[in-house]
Amino acid sequence: MRLLARHAIRLLGQENSAGEVASLSRGAIRLKATTGYLNLATASVQPLEPEKQVLRKNSPLTDSFGRHHTYLRISLTERCNLRCDYCMPAEGVPLQPKNKLLTTEEILRLARIFVEQGVRKIRLTGGEPTVRRDIVEIVAQMKALPELEQIGITTNGLVLTRLLLPLQRAGLDNLNISLDTLKRDRFEKITRRKGWERVIAGIDLAVQLGYRPKVNCVLMRDFNEDEICDFVEFTRNRPVDVRFIEYMPFSGNKWHTERLISYKDTLQIIRQRWPDFKALPNGPNDTSKAYAVPGFKGQVGFITSMTEHFCGTCNRLRLTADGNIKVCLFGNKEFSLRDAMRDESVSEEQLVDLIGAAVQRKKKQHADAAPRLHHHLHPYSYHHAYHTSRLQLQARNYSQLTHVDGQGKAQMVDVGAKPSTTRLARAEATVQVGEKLTQLIADNQVAKGDVLTVAQIAGIMGAKRTAELIPLCHNISLSSVKVQATLLKTEQSVRLEATVRCSGQTGVEMEALTAVSVAALTVYDMCKAVSHDICITNVRLLSKSGGKRDFQREEPQNGIVTEVE
């Protein structure tokens, strides 16, 4: 039971404490509600019959935004038989010890558990899944799961001519093939291996066997953008779905956005040659925007994870080769089901509870925490991002950001067309000062003077200079700035609250936040001669009104001890 609690604590992440694992009762993990993920707006979902709504709501595979996850991607291996230069060095990469990876029995057990909880589609990925000797057996055993509707595989296609017929007999339903070029020489240069002919032969064999394979192509500027129309032409006589995937422009420590070719740019290139290139209907959980040239046997799709995310309808979970569950491809949080499964004291019911707890931690969208870069990137950096389990980066989502244009360049928002309204914003910050400083502030004995009054004045001045401190922030004519400093003796802290008002075309939340931040820094500056164990915390917006989207946070429950107005 202690191990199960440790698993849950690890899942909660560094920002939460062990105290948030409220209890373990009858094998069920109950997590305390924490501000920040239970107060977010619920994403829209497709209407269901009432009884199905109840089942989905109570399912461990339904997250806090109502998204029910029916699609599981399982990475069978970290190994690959290609050496694509954007994935790994020519000599390969260090692999995890075998005992750290899931065994075949563990993979099949987890697949069964997920299917019993509501997964209806499984895709086997890697690395390269066909390097496993037991790939056919795994497909056959998963296909035998009574409630599983589809099983697919994503592969580089090198050995399809040898394996596809046995895989079809085992029950393989669908097939994705990764191919970034239709030119033999370019293929050998990028993959450092021969085999382009075998991949094309594998695609043609798949068509002959009745499949409609999906061909995944990562578009990169100055690499294969000259082949965009060639890939569309590839669909003329073949019933295949070519899917252009936007390049995730991360390399080493830097974003290289110059290599990104956006969906709209690609669409424009295609329509220059085929003006009647038209959109097709999409399913509710499709990641690809479907298009086709009239009369062609195949179609084209666009996976726009960089410029237009599809988080609102995401129904996918990922299981890594070493047994971690990932609820988001772009997230850095992973949670080991392997460790829990190998602990004999953890029951299957408890394992399901852990899966449910992981799903509940899924965010509304992968860009909601801003485009952050994480330090521990898996060596297989891009092409297998759609079937590699441990890519850890946050996507830049330019189309959703107001202060950058479509190419990621900085721009100031034009508010000229907005109506002029009365705008109001409130923000707060807390400065933990400790017992000694609390008494000195209360007695007005701090050597630099009246801490609360000076902090109040500094906050007002800070609000008025916000446009000089925050890039691209509008210079606003403020009608009122009020900063309140409160000494909380019991908490040994100073609470700062700012209320800012204006009549204008843009809001004043940044002015309110700047006011409390500058006031908090002033408290630190005036008190640092006494102690450096001062902590500025809880800087946050309390409310804003008068704009397109009002906001109201629940009021803090702090007792007022000393007040300066």
Curated annotation (Swiss-Prot):
GO terms for cellular component: mitochondrial matrix. Binds 2 [4Fe-4S] clusters. Binds 1 [4Fe-4S] cluster coordinated with 3 cysteines and an exchangeable S-adenosyl-L-methionine and 1 [4Fe-4S] cluster coordinated with 3 cysteines and the GTP-derived substrate. Its cofactor is [4Fe-4S] cluster. The keyword Cytoplasm does not apply. Pathway: Cofactor biosynthesis; molybdopterin biosynthesis. GO terms for molecular function: 4 iron, 4 sulfur cluster binding; cyclic pyranopterin monophosphate synthase activity; GTP 3',8'-cyclase activity; GTP binding; metal ion binding. CDD domains: MoaC_PE (cd01420), Radical_SAM (cd01335), Twitch_MoaA (cd21117). [4Fe-4S] cluster 2 binds at C311, C314, C328. Keywords: 4Fe-4S, GTP-binding, Iron, Iron-sulfur, Lyase, Metal-binding, Molybdenum cofactor biosynthesis, Nucleotide-binding, S-adenosyl-L-methionine. The active site is at D525. It comes from the Eukaryota. Residues 3-367 are annotated as: Molybdenum cofactor biosynthesis protein A. [4Fe-4S] cluster 1 binds at C80, C84, C87. It holds the Pfam family Mob_synth_C. GO terms for biological process: inter-male aggressive behavior; Mo-molybdopterin cofactor biosynthetic process; molybdopterin cofactor biosynthetic process. InterPro entries: Aldolase_TIM, Elp3/MiaA/NifB-like_rSAM, MoaA, MoaA_NifB_PqqE_Fe-S-bd_CS, MoaA_twitch, MoaC, MoaC_bact/euk, MoaC_sf. In the C-terminal section; belongs to the MoaC family. Isoform Mocs1a seems to be translated from a bicistronic transcript while isoform Mocs1b seems to be translated from a monocistronic mRNA that is derived by alternative splicing. Isoform Mocs1a and isoform Mocs1b probably form a heterooligomer. Isoform Mocs1a and isoform Mocs1b probably form a complex that catalyzes the conversion of 5'-GTP to cyclic pyranopterin monophosphate (cPMP). Mocs1a catalyzes the cyclization of GTP to (8S)-3',8-cyclo-7,8-dihydroguanosine 5'-triphosphate and Mocs1b catalyzes the subsequent conversion of (8S)-3',8-cyclo-7,8-dihydroguanosine 5'-triphosphate to cPMP. This is Molybdenum cofactor biosynthesis protein 1. It comes from Drosophila melanogaster (Fruit fly). The gene is Mocs1.
